[in-house]
Amino acid sequence: MGVITSESEYVSSLSAEKLYRGIVEDGNIIYPKALPRFIEKAETLEGDGGPGTIKKLTFVGDFGSTKQHIDMVDRENCAYTYSVYEGIALSDQPLEKIVFEFKLVPTPEEGCIVKSTTKYYTKGDDIELSKDYLEAGIERFEGFTKAVESFLLANPDYNKDSN
């Protein structure tokens, strides 16, 4: 098995705590609202949201679903890691799983820097993923995060107590 890594970061105007809560703790509620053209349903299949939890995202139309395993949750440091191990995200490439790691770093301006690392675990050591595929993955992750950010900005009272 090979591992191919890509990284990205961008600045959010939301506090790390508020964005973290929206993505990690309230994702099952927010994802379908923030991305209604893409996500039909987000649900926890087993677990309490901590490491070992299994989540499922069901996409709109005929795009199927993905299952995620929560690997690490660190609310204090606004860090989160999960693995996609089943579903549409793995169907078009020879991948065993995709691991998403992200950390939200507070900025002096009360926003945060969204840092993400994506690790693609291939079904062989000799497999390469195209630059376009890796860039599209970064764009999807950033688009997803920015959609949650936009939802929270448009609904400022949503998780006000964590701002």
From Swiss-Prot:
Trans-zeatin binds at residues 68, 82, 133. Expressed in nodules, but not in leaves, stems, flowers and roots. Specifically located in the nodule cortex. GO terms for biological process: abscisic acid-activated signaling pathway; cytokinin-activated signaling pathway; defense response; nodulation. Induction: Up-regulated during nodulation, but not by Nod factors or pathogen infection. Pfam families: Bet_v_1. One of its GO terms (molecular function) is abscisic acid binding. Gene3D superfamilies: 3.30.530.20. Transmembrane segments: none annotated. The NT13 molecules that have dimerized without cytokinin ligand most probably lose their binding properties because it seems unlikely that the dimer can dissociate back to the monomer. Asp-62 from the complementary protein molecule forms hydrogen bonds with the cytokinin scaffold. Belongs to the BetVI family. Homodimer. This is Nodulin-13. The gene is N13.
